Structures are given as C-alpha cells and as structure tokens.
A protein has these predicted regions:
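Conserved long alpha-helical elements within nucleotide-processing catalytic cores of c-di-GMP signaling
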Residues: 1, 7-34, 43-47, 57-65, ...
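Output-coupling edge of small sensory domains
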Residues: 73, 89-91, 157-159
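Flexible, glycine/charge-rich interdomain/linker segments that couple
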Residues: 85, 94, 113-138, 155
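Active-site core of bacterial EAL-family cyclic-dinucleotide phosphodiesterase domains
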Residues: 131-168
Length: 168
C-alpha cells in the first residue's frame, strides 16, 4: 500500500520563507515520516510530495491517521510557525495499480481530485476511481496513437429532433 502526502501550495511557502527555510521544513517533515515509518519506507518523490510504503492495510490506516493528526498542528522553522495543508492519496497494490507507470498516473489523477476537495483531504482509491482513471488513460492512449499515426478522424453526427423536426 502507498500513501502519497502532497503539500498543497508549498510554492507559496517557498516564496515567503525562501529556499533555505523551505528546505529545512522539508527536512523536518522527512525526519518525522522517517521516525514514524522507518528506513526504506519513506521517499521524497517530488519537491512537495512524499510517498510512504506500508506493508499492510492496517499499517496504512494507522499511518494515515497519525500523519493527518500531525499535520493538524503547526511546523516550526526558524521561529516561524507554519500551518501546512496536505492532500493524502492512498493506493493499494495490486487492486489499484499493477505497474509503476500506472501508480504514478493514478496518483496524479487522485491528487487532481483531492485538490478539488479542499485542504487536509484524504482520497483513497476505490474501484470506481480506478475504473475512471483507466477509462481516461485508454482515451489518452487512443488519441495519442491516432495523432502519431495521422489517423485521427473526426465525424460529425447531426442530431435530428423529431419534436422540432430539425437538426439541433
């Protein structure tokens, strides 16, 4: 199981605090996650994201609750108290993804959905979201292949209204 913690609007904090202080904040978050989860379970996967590997669903649930609880309080860097908003995405292997590329694509899809929900949100992948992502991915692949092979044809199918007796 994978937990991805995305720090919402971290670029604002980086702009306000500067590179040195924002790096210190990331270091503190990384150390907290390392202490909580252990070696080889925490990865800084992007400038504003961490990924935590959990061995079991129970461990994943426990970590999710503890991380959410910690992010409800402020982080302190150079006497600055910083409230961080985060979006957490939970994905289960092999039900939600089977390959690393699918994991990353699904993660981005879920983070996009989490961003629409507000701050301190946890989105857990389910069968519906997984199917939605896979449908979207099939369309993206089909469109990319059609463009690459110059075989992209668009058909206009007019709709005739029987009530109005005209094309609408």
């Amino acid at each position: 199981d994978r937990l991805t913690i995305h720090l919402s609007k971290f670029y604002h904090i980086h702009t306000i605090l500067g590179t040195e202080n924002s790096n210190e904040l990331l270091r503190e978050i990384g150390e907290y996650l390392y202490d909580l989860c252990g070696k080889f379970h925490v990865f800084h996967t992007a400038g504003d994201a961490f990924t935590v590997f959990a061995d079991t669903k129970e461990q994943c649930e426990r970590l999710k609750c503890e991380i959410q609880k910690r992010f409800e309080s402020d982080w302190v860097v150079q006497e600055n108290r910083i409230a961080l908003d985060m979006e957490t995405v939970v994905q289960h292997y092999p039900t939600d993804f089977k390959a690393i590329a699918e994991y990353y694509g699904m993660r981005e899809f879920l983070l996009e959905n989490a961003g629409k929900s507000g701050a301190q949100v946890i989105v857990e992948a389910d069968a519906d979201m997984t199917a939605q992502y896979r449908r979207r991915r099939k369309v993206e692949i089909a469109v990319a292949r059609a463009i690459r092979e110059k075989g992209f044809l668009v058909y206009y199918q007019p709709v005739y209204s029987l009530k109005e007796k005209q094309i609408v």
